[in-house]
Swiss-Prot record:
Family: Belongs to the avian keratin family.
This protein's name: Feather keratin Cos2-3
Entry's Gene Ontology cellular component terms: intermediate filament
Lineage: Eukaryota, Metazoa, Chordata, Craniata, Vertebrata
Highest rank taxon of the organism: Eukaryota
Gene Ontology molecular-function annotations: structural constituent of cytoskeleton
Cited InterPro entries: Keratin
Keyword line: Acetylation, Keratin
Subunit structure: The avian keratins (F-ker, S-ker, C-ker and B-ker) are a complex mixture of very similar polypeptides.
Record PANTHER family: BETA-KERATIN-RELATED PROTEIN-RELATED
Source species: Columba livia
Residues modified to N-acetylserine: 2
């Protein structure tokens, strides 16, 4: 690439300075050039599933799960009574009282 510098050196006006400096703007002009930038490969790591648990008296994958399910209740209302919804459990953790069926 060929460049030229149109800035002329400053002429000292007085004693010779210790360093060459001038207050005139110095512009450097170069020919147009093409630059190709290739991005490097990016590795993105996505988080795995977030597992959360709530303290409940349930047994999963056991032959006794049917028996345990019959004694589970929320504020005295059996979970398997046919009129149970999740608002009972969630309201229990939020501090409000469950409504009976």
């Amino acid at each position: 690439m060929s460049c030229y510098n149109p800035c002329l050196p400053c002429q000292p006006c007085g004693p010779t300075p210790l360093a060459n400096s001038c207050n005139e703007p110095c512009v450097r002009q170069c020919q147009s050039s093409n630059v190709v930038i290739e991005p490097s490969s990016v590795v993105v790591i996505l988080p795995g599933p977030i597992l959360s648990s709530f303290p409940q008296n349930t047994v999963v994958g056991s032959s006794t799960s049917a028996a345990v399910g019959s004694i589970l209740s929320c504020e005295g209302v059996p979970i398997n009574s046919g009129c149970f919804d999740l608002s009972c459990i969630t309201s229990r953790y939020c501090g409000s009282r469950c409504q009976p069926c």
